[in-house]
Protein backbone atom coordinates (compact mmCIF):
# COMPACT_ATOMS: atom_id res chain seq x y z
CA UNK A 1 0.00 0.00 0.00
CA UNK A 2 1.03 3.61 -0.52
CA UNK A 3 1.59 6.00 2.39
CA UNK A 4 -0.11 9.27 1.46
CA UNK A 5 0.22 12.40 3.59
CA UNK A 6 -2.17 15.27 4.19
CA UNK A 7 -3.42 17.95 6.55
CA UNK A 8 -7.03 16.98 7.20
CA UNK A 9 -7.78 20.23 9.02
CA UNK A 10 -7.18 23.38 6.97
CA UNK A 11 -9.89 25.96 7.73
CA UNK A 12 -10.26 28.67 5.11
CA UNK A 13 -12.55 31.55 6.20
CA UNK A 14 -14.98 33.74 4.26
CA UNK A 15 -12.57 36.68 4.32
CA UNK A 16 -9.79 34.46 2.92
CA UNK A 17 -11.62 33.16 -0.15
CA UNK A 18 -9.61 35.47 -2.41
CA UNK A 19 -6.59 33.41 -1.30
CA UNK A 20 -8.13 30.06 -2.30
CA UNK A 21 -5.77 29.57 -5.23
CA UNK A 22 -2.80 30.30 -2.97
CA UNK A 23 -4.00 27.76 -0.41
CA UNK A 24 -4.46 25.11 -3.10
CA UNK A 25 -1.04 25.64 -4.68
CA UNK A 26 0.67 25.43 -1.29
CA UNK A 27 -1.22 22.26 -0.41
CA UNK A 28 -0.33 20.66 -3.74
CA UNK A 29 3.35 21.44 -3.13
CA UNK A 30 3.54 19.60 0.20
CA UNK A 31 0.61 17.13 0.39
CA UNK A 32 -0.26 13.96 -1.54
CA UNK A 33 -3.97 14.79 -1.32
CA UNK A 34 -5.98 17.50 0.39
CA UNK A 35 -9.44 17.64 2.00
CA UNK A 36 -10.20 21.36 2.42
CA UNK A 37 -12.35 22.32 5.42
CA UNK A 38 -14.23 25.55 4.74
CA UNK A 39 -14.92 27.49 7.96
CA UNK A 40 -18.44 29.01 7.88
CA UNK A 41 -18.12 30.95 11.15
CA UNK A 42 -17.38 34.52 12.19
CA UNK A 43 -16.98 36.47 15.42
CA UNK A 44 -19.91 38.66 16.44
CA UNK A 45 -20.53 40.92 19.43
CA UNK A 46 -23.31 40.14 21.88
CA UNK A 47 -25.39 42.85 23.57
CA UNK A 48 -23.00 42.69 26.52
CA UNK A 49 -20.05 43.35 24.22
CA UNK A 50 -18.61 39.85 24.55
CA UNK A 51 -17.31 38.02 21.50
CA UNK A 52 -19.30 35.06 20.18
CA UNK A 53 -18.63 32.74 17.25
CA UNK A 54 -21.64 32.23 14.99
CA UNK A 55 -22.42 31.20 11.42
CA UNK A 56 -21.70 33.69 8.65
CA UNK A 57 -24.71 34.98 6.68
CA UNK A 58 -26.25 32.18 4.61
CA UNK A 59 -25.70 33.95 1.29
CA UNK A 60 -21.96 34.33 2.02
CA UNK A 61 -21.64 30.67 2.96
CA UNK A 62 -23.50 29.51 -0.15
CA UNK A 63 -21.37 31.67 -2.43
CA UNK A 64 -18.14 30.46 -0.83
CA UNK A 65 -19.26 26.83 -0.99
CA UNK A 66 -19.81 27.12 -4.73
CA UNK A 67 -16.34 28.65 -5.13
CA UNK A 68 -14.88 25.70 -3.23
CA UNK A 69 -16.89 23.26 -5.37
CA UNK A 70 -15.68 24.89 -8.58
CA UNK A 71 -12.06 24.84 -7.43
CA UNK A 72 -12.13 21.21 -6.26
CA UNK A 73 -13.62 20.09 -9.58
CA UNK A 74 -10.92 22.01 -11.44
CA UNK A 75 -8.11 20.49 -9.36
CA UNK A 76 -9.61 16.99 -9.64
CA UNK A 77 -9.72 17.35 -13.43
CA UNK A 78 -5.99 18.12 -13.34
CA UNK A 79 -5.38 14.83 -11.53
CA UNK A 80 -4.88 16.01 -7.94
CA UNK A 81 -7.06 14.26 -5.28
CA UNK A 82 -8.79 17.09 -3.41
CA UNK A 83 -11.96 16.67 -1.34
CA UNK A 84 -14.72 19.11 -0.43
CA UNK A 85 -15.34 19.65 3.27
CA UNK A 86 -16.39 22.08 5.97
CA UNK A 87 -16.34 22.45 9.75
CA UNK A 88 -19.51 21.68 11.69
CA UNK A 89 -19.97 22.75 15.33
CA UNK A 90 -23.72 22.62 15.95
CA UNK A 91 -24.66 23.87 19.40
CA UNK A 92 -21.35 22.66 20.84
CA UNK A 93 -22.88 19.75 22.79
CA UNK A 94 -21.35 16.99 20.62
CA UNK A 95 -17.98 18.51 19.78
CA UNK A 96 -16.54 20.04 16.62
CA UNK A 97 -16.30 17.87 13.48
CA UNK A 98 -14.98 18.36 9.97
CA UNK A 99 -17.34 16.93 7.36
CA UNK A 100 -15.87 15.61 4.09
CA UNK A 101 -17.41 14.17 0.92
CA UNK A 102 -16.23 11.72 -1.71
CA UNK A 103 -18.04 13.52 -4.53
CA UNK A 104 -18.31 17.23 -5.25
CA UNK A 105 -22.10 17.51 -5.35
CA UNK A 106 -23.17 17.79 -1.72
CA UNK A 107 -24.76 20.78 0.07
CA UNK A 108 -23.52 22.13 3.38
CA UNK A 109 -25.84 21.50 6.35
CA UNK A 110 -25.81 23.11 9.83
CA UNK A 111 -28.02 21.12 12.25
CA UNK A 112 -27.58 21.61 15.98
CA UNK A 113 -26.75 18.02 16.99
CA UNK A 114 -24.40 15.29 15.74
CA UNK A 115 -27.16 12.71 15.30
CA UNK A 116 -29.07 15.21 13.13
CA UNK A 117 -25.92 15.80 11.08
CA UNK A 118 -25.55 12.07 10.51
CA UNK A 119 -29.19 11.85 9.39
CA UNK A 120 -28.73 14.77 6.98
CA UNK A 121 -26.09 12.77 5.11
CA UNK A 122 -27.67 9.31 5.21
CA UNK A 123 -26.99 7.34 2.03
CA UNK A 124 -24.24 9.82 1.19
CA UNK A 125 -20.49 9.15 1.04
CA UNK A 126 -19.72 11.52 3.92
CA UNK A 127 -17.59 11.33 7.06
CA UNK A 128 -17.46 13.63 10.10
CA UNK A 129 -14.10 13.68 11.91
CA UNK A 130 -14.06 15.03 15.49
CA UNK A 131 -11.17 17.20 16.65
CA UNK A 132 -9.75 18.68 19.89
CA UNK A 133 -11.98 16.11 21.57
CA UNK A 134 -10.71 16.68 25.13
CA UNK A 135 -12.37 20.05 25.70
CA UNK A 136 -15.25 20.21 28.17
CA UNK A 137 -18.42 18.26 27.36
CA UNK A 138 -21.14 20.54 25.95
CA UNK A 139 -18.47 23.16 25.31
CA UNK A 140 -17.06 21.82 22.00
CA UNK A 141 -15.54 18.69 23.56
CA UNK A 142 -16.46 15.30 22.10
CA UNK A 143 -19.66 13.58 23.21
CA UNK A 144 -18.73 9.91 22.85
CA UNK A 145 -22.27 8.86 23.82
CA UNK A 146 -23.58 10.00 20.43
CA UNK A 147 -20.59 8.81 18.37
CA UNK A 148 -21.15 6.66 15.27
CA UNK A 149 -18.21 4.51 14.08
CA UNK A 150 -19.31 4.44 10.45
CA UNK A 151 -19.88 8.19 10.15
CA UNK A 152 -16.76 9.07 12.18
CA UNK A 153 -14.17 6.28 11.69
CA UNK A 154 -11.33 8.17 13.39
CA UNK A 155 -10.61 11.24 15.51
CA UNK A 156 -8.06 14.04 15.31
CA UNK A 157 -6.24 13.91 18.65
CA UNK A 158 -3.29 16.25 17.98
CA UNK A 159 -3.28 19.67 16.32
CA UNK A 160 -2.36 23.29 17.00
CA UNK A 161 -4.68 22.98 20.02
CA UNK A 162 -2.45 20.31 21.58
CA UNK A 163 -3.05 16.65 22.39
CA UNK A 164 -6.45 15.12 23.23
CA UNK A 165 -5.29 11.54 23.81
CA UNK A 166 -5.76 11.95 27.56
CA UNK A 167 -5.62 14.70 30.18
CA UNK A 168 -2.24 13.78 31.70
CA UNK A 169 0.18 13.52 28.76
CA UNK A 170 3.15 15.80 28.18
CA UNK A 171 1.54 17.64 25.25
CA UNK A 172 -1.00 19.97 26.85
CA UNK A 173 -3.93 21.94 25.41
CA UNK A 174 -3.17 25.41 26.74
CA UNK A 175 -2.74 27.36 23.52
CA UNK A 176 -6.42 28.36 23.29
CA UNK A 177 -7.21 29.24 26.89
CA UNK A 178 -10.64 30.66 26.01
CA UNK A 179 -11.75 27.11 25.17
CA UNK A 180 -10.70 25.83 28.56
CA UNK A 181 -8.27 23.12 29.69
CA UNK A 182 -8.51 19.54 28.48
CA UNK A 183 -10.52 17.09 30.52
CA UNK A 184 -10.47 13.35 31.11
CA UNK A 185 -14.22 13.15 30.52
CA UNK A 186 -14.06 13.63 26.76
CA UNK A 187 -10.51 12.65 25.76
CA UNK A 188 -9.75 9.98 23.15
CA UNK A 189 -9.13 7.31 25.78
CA UNK A 190 -12.72 7.62 27.00
CA UNK A 191 -13.95 6.75 23.52
CA UNK A 192 -11.81 3.62 23.48
CA UNK A 193 -12.98 2.66 26.97
CA UNK A 194 -16.56 2.90 25.73
CA UNK A 195 -15.73 0.12 23.27
CA UNK A 196 -15.75 2.34 20.20
CA UNK A 197 -13.60 1.34 17.24
CA UNK A 198 -12.14 4.71 16.33
CA UNK A 199 -8.76 5.41 14.77
CA UNK A 200 -6.63 8.46 15.52
CA UNK A 201 -4.74 11.06 13.49
CA UNK A 202 -3.01 14.42 13.82
CA UNK A 203 -3.75 17.46 11.66
CA UNK A 204 -3.22 21.17 11.90
CA UNK A 205 -6.44 23.03 12.70
CA UNK A 206 -4.73 25.65 10.57
CA UNK A 207 -6.48 28.93 9.81
CA UNK A 208 -3.75 30.86 7.97
CA UNK A 209 -1.71 28.34 5.99
CA UNK A 210 -2.57 24.72 5.14
CA UNK A 211 -0.19 21.95 6.19
CA UNK A 212 1.74 23.82 8.90
CA UNK A 213 4.62 21.46 9.70
CA UNK A 214 4.64 22.13 13.45
CA UNK A 215 0.93 21.40 13.86
CA UNK A 216 0.88 17.76 12.81
CA UNK A 217 -0.21 15.75 9.80
CA UNK A 218 -1.98 12.55 8.82
CA UNK A 219 -0.92 9.48 6.86
CA UNK A 220 -3.31 7.20 4.96
CA UNK A 221 -2.44 3.68 3.80
CA UNK A 222 -4.19 3.46 0.43
CA UNK A 223 -4.00 1.19 -2.60
CA UNK A 224 -3.31 4.21 -4.82
CA UNK A 225 -3.76 7.98 -4.83
CA UNK A 226 -7.23 8.07 -6.37
CA UNK A 227 -10.01 9.70 -4.36
CA UNK A 228 -11.86 6.40 -4.19
CA UNK A 229 -8.85 4.50 -2.79
CA UNK A 230 -8.09 7.23 -0.26
CA UNK A 231 -11.74 7.30 0.81
CA UNK A 232 -11.80 3.52 1.28
CA UNK A 233 -8.65 3.72 3.42
CA UNK A 234 -10.10 6.44 5.63
CA UNK A 235 -13.35 4.53 6.12
CA UNK A 236 -11.29 1.44 7.05
CA UNK A 237 -9.26 3.45 9.63
CA UNK A 238 -5.92 2.76 7.89
CA UNK A 239 -4.66 6.06 9.22
CA UNK A 240 -2.16 7.45 11.72
CA UNK A 241 -0.82 10.84 12.73
CA UNK A 242 2.46 12.53 13.62
CA UNK A 243 2.93 15.67 15.69
CA UNK A 244 5.76 17.03 13.53
CA UNK A 245 8.15 15.19 11.16
CA UNK A 246 6.81 12.32 9.12
CA UNK A 247 7.31 8.73 10.26
CA UNK A 248 7.11 5.58 8.15
CA UNK A 249 5.01 3.20 10.26
CA UNK A 250 3.83 -0.31 9.45
CA UNK A 251 1.70 -2.14 12.01
CA UNK A 252 -0.10 -5.47 11.66
CA UNK A 253 -1.86 -7.98 13.90
CA UNK A 254 -1.86 -11.47 12.41
CA UNK A 255 -1.04 -9.82 9.10
CA UNK A 256 -4.03 -7.48 9.20
CA UNK A 257 -3.26 -3.75 8.82
CA UNK A 258 -3.99 -0.97 11.28
CA UNK A 259 -7.68 -0.20 11.54
CA UNK A 260 -8.68 -3.86 11.31
CA UNK A 261 -10.84 -5.65 13.88
CA UNK A 262 -9.60 -8.96 15.30
CA UNK A 263 -11.21 -11.20 17.94
CA UNK A 264 -9.89 -11.14 21.49
CA UNK A 265 -7.13 -13.64 22.22
CA UNK A 266 -3.48 -14.28 21.53
CA UNK A 267 -2.11 -12.64 18.38
CA UNK A 268 1.13 -11.83 16.60
CA UNK A 269 1.90 -8.11 16.47
CA UNK A 270 4.50 -6.79 14.04
CA UNK A 271 5.62 -3.21 13.57
CA UNK A 272 8.28 -1.22 11.77
CA UNK A 273 9.07 2.44 12.46
CA UNK A 274 11.39 4.77 10.55
CA UNK A 275 11.64 8.32 11.87
CA UNK A 276 13.39 11.59 11.11
CA UNK A 277 15.40 11.39 14.33
CA UNK A 278 16.67 8.72 16.69
CA UNK A 279 13.87 6.56 18.09
CA UNK A 280 13.88 6.25 21.87
CA UNK A 281 11.18 3.61 22.28
CA UNK A 282 7.90 2.23 20.97
CA UNK A 283 5.12 1.85 23.53
CA UNK A 284 2.34 -0.73 23.14
CA UNK A 285 -0.82 0.12 25.06
CA UNK A 286 -3.58 -2.26 26.08
CA UNK A 287 -6.77 -0.88 27.59
CA UNK A 288 -5.06 2.54 27.64
CA UNK A 289 -2.29 1.15 29.89
CA UNK A 290 1.34 0.63 28.89
CA UNK A 291 1.58 -3.13 28.32
CA UNK A 292 4.91 -3.58 26.54
CA UNK A 293 7.76 -1.37 25.41
CA UNK A 294 10.39 -1.85 22.71
CA UNK A 295 13.40 0.25 23.73
CA UNK A 296 15.68 1.37 20.91
CA UNK A 297 17.81 3.80 22.91
CA UNK A 298 21.15 2.23 23.77
CA UNK A 299 21.16 -0.15 20.81
CA UNK A 300 23.01 2.04 18.33
CA UNK A 301 24.76 5.05 19.92
CA UNK A 302 28.12 3.39 20.68
CA UNK A 303 28.40 1.28 17.55
CA UNK A 304 31.51 2.19 15.60
CA UNK A 305 31.16 3.13 11.95
CA UNK A 306 33.60 1.41 9.61
CA UNK A 307 35.96 3.49 7.49
CA UNK A 308 34.35 2.30 4.26
CA UNK A 309 30.81 1.96 5.59
CA UNK A 310 28.07 3.91 3.85
CA UNK A 311 25.53 5.41 6.24
CA UNK A 312 22.35 7.46 5.97
CA UNK A 313 22.27 10.83 7.71
CA UNK A 314 19.26 13.12 8.13
CA UNK A 315 19.52 16.74 9.26
CA UNK A 316 17.31 19.82 9.42
CA UNK A 317 18.07 23.20 7.87
CA UNK A 318 16.32 26.14 9.54
CA UNK A 319 16.19 29.76 8.40
CA UNK A 320 15.15 32.97 10.15
CA UNK A 321 16.04 34.99 13.21
CA UNK A 322 14.10 33.12 15.84
CA UNK A 323 10.80 33.70 17.60
CA UNK A 324 11.80 36.81 19.60
CA UNK A 325 10.16 39.94 18.11
CA UNK A 326 12.56 42.23 19.99
CA UNK A 327 15.18 41.65 17.31
CA UNK A 328 15.00 43.28 13.87
CA UNK A 329 11.57 44.77 14.49
CA UNK A 330 11.36 46.32 11.04
CA UNK A 331 12.39 43.18 9.16
CA UNK A 332 9.01 41.48 8.83
CA UNK A 333 9.99 39.23 5.92
CA UNK A 334 13.30 37.73 4.88
CA UNK A 335 14.00 35.69 1.74
CA UNK A 336 16.76 33.13 1.44
CA UNK A 337 18.21 31.47 -1.66
CA UNK A 338 20.55 28.55 -1.33
CA UNK A 339 21.69 25.19 -2.59
CA UNK A 340 22.82 21.90 -1.10
CA UNK A 341 25.26 19.39 -2.55
CA UNK A 342 26.29 16.14 -0.88
CA UNK A 343 29.19 13.82 -1.80
CA UNK A 344 26.90 10.80 -1.70
CA UNK A 345 23.21 10.69 -2.62
CA UNK A 346 20.10 12.59 -1.53
CA UNK A 347 17.74 9.84 -0.35
CA UNK A 348 14.77 12.11 0.37
CA UNK A 349 13.83 15.68 1.25
CA UNK A 350 11.02 16.53 3.66
CA UNK A 351 9.38 19.94 3.22
CA UNK A 352 9.19 21.18 6.82
CA UNK A 353 7.30 24.36 5.92
CA UNK A 354 5.23 26.53 8.25
CA UNK A 355 4.39 29.39 5.89
CA UNK A 356 4.02 30.50 2.29
CA UNK A 357 6.87 31.48 0.00
CA UNK A 358 8.84 28.22 0.01
CA UNK A 359 10.20 26.48 -3.08
CA UNK A 360 12.39 23.45 -3.73
CA UNK A 361 13.72 23.04 -7.27
CA UNK A 362 16.44 21.61 -9.51
CA UNK A 363 16.56 18.44 -7.41
CA UNK A 364 19.13 15.92 -8.65
CA UNK A 365 20.59 12.73 -7.23
CA UNK A 366 23.01 14.65 -5.02
CA UNK A 367 21.92 18.30 -5.00
CA UNK A 368 19.01 20.71 -4.79
CA UNK A 369 18.23 24.41 -4.78
CA UNK A 370 15.73 26.22 -2.61
CA UNK A 371 14.04 29.56 -2.01
CA UNK A 372 12.83 30.10 1.55
CA UNK A 373 10.75 32.91 3.05
CA UNK A 374 10.71 33.57 6.79
CA UNK A 375 8.43 35.94 8.66
CA UNK A 376 8.47 37.79 11.95
CA UNK A 377 5.40 35.75 12.91
CA UNK A 378 4.36 32.57 11.12
CA UNK A 379 1.27 30.39 11.24
CA UNK A 380 2.80 28.28 14.00
CA UNK A 381 3.08 31.32 16.28
CA UNK A 382 6.83 31.81 15.84
Where do the protein language model's features map onto the residues?
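Extended, charged catalytic domains and RNA/DNA-binding interfaces, predominantly
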Residues: 1-382
